[in-house]
């Protein structure tokens, strides 16, 4: 076997193993999603969000979280889903996203937080190909847990187009 084949095989194993771990799962409509717990800083109930002019519609504005201004993105709108009224289960998941060398605290509005799951690599499959026209690089993979499908997200990529706007809001 060539060294390249061995290195590629090691890389594939490392990638699969690196996806295993604890995920905070949450709902958007009838779909379940997961984000690595290590990115989550806290979960807060829905609160008043101060709108910011001239931002995309999915950027809801900012909140004052214990003296720190946190930009808030409605993940439902970011994904192009129909807007829904917020309920008592709607909450903001405060996450830390990577932008180059810096980290930005952001709030992500979700319909409901479900649970923290320890997902093993055997429960995670690669993201299927949906053709060239659909972008899936924001998905880490698809988990099958307890008979249900969970789409594992890479919020760094989901929110990458927003971080420039949100950094400006944050400053």
Feature names for model-found ranges:
Residues 1-171:
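An acidic, low-aromatic, low-complexity terminal/linker signal
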């Amino acid at each position: 076997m060539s060294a390249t084949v061995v290195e590629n095989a090691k890389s594939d194993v490392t990638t699969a193993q690196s996806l295993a771990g604890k995920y905070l799962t949450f709902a958007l409509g009838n779909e379940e999603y997961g984000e690595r717990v290590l990115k989550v800083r806290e979960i807060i109930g829905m609160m008043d969000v101060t709108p910011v002019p001239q931002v995309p519609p999915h950027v809801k504005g900012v909140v004052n979280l214990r003296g720190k201004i946190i930009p808030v993105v409605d993940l439902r709108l970011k994904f192009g889903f129909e807007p829904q009224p917020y309920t008592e289960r709607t909450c903001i998941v405060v996450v830390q996203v990577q932008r180059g060398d810096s980290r930005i605290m952001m709030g992500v509005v979700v319909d409901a937080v479900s649970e923290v799951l320890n997902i093993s690599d055997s429960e995670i499959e690669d993201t299927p190909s949906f053709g060239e026209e659909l972008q899936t690089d924001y998905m880490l993979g698809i988990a099958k847990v307890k008979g249900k499908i969970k789409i594992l997200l890479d919020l760094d990529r989901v929110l990458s187009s927003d971080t420039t706007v949100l950094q400006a809001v944050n400053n």
